Amino acid sequence: MLLRVKEESSEELAAFVTATRDWLHAPQIAVDLDWSSYAGKRKHYPWFLLAALVLAENGVRVFMHGASGHTINRLYTEEVLPELGHALCETWQEVENTLNRVNFAYLSLDAYCPPLGNIIQLRNVLGLRSPVHTLSRLINPLNAQCSLQAIFHPAYRESHQFAAQQLGYQNSMVIKGEGGEFERNPDGRC
């Protein structure tokens, strides 16, 4: 937790992500877009899901990963996708089959990396987010050519950008997303 208070450097984030990716041994599944969804929505509905699904309907293979329940009073992607008619994947094989069928698949952190899933759930116990909240957005487990990450606190933008660069991500976009998810604030000015 001291690392979180001090704030992780981009080098530390890149090292955490590299170690995680080495541990995962994720299969080689072709995806165009890695979309992380870890924050949950507090003020608005997760409209970004509609954008991801429209991309999928138009031939873009979107892999979304995230976590739910770690922060109270949030609406998480895992809760909304079934309401939109999209089942949550539980294995890499399901991810591959679903991507081949509809170009969109979601896999939770609990499913693809249970140790990090357990740590992220300690948020309410410890009273603050852990470095896992930061590094999970950068994992890009299927090594997509393009990665989307949202941060809530602008101070994290630079560390995410530099970590992505150190990880060799060619096309990585980091924005201050509404509620920490990858979408602009619908109430904000353009």
Question: What residue ranges belong to the model's regions?
Answer:
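Glycine-rich anion-binding loops and their surrounding alpha/beta cores
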Residues: 12-27, 82-89, 94-190
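A glycine-rich phosphate/pyrophosphate-binding beta-strand-loop-alpha-helix module
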Residues: 46-95, 100
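Short secondary-structure boundary/capping elements
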Residues: 43-47, 127-130
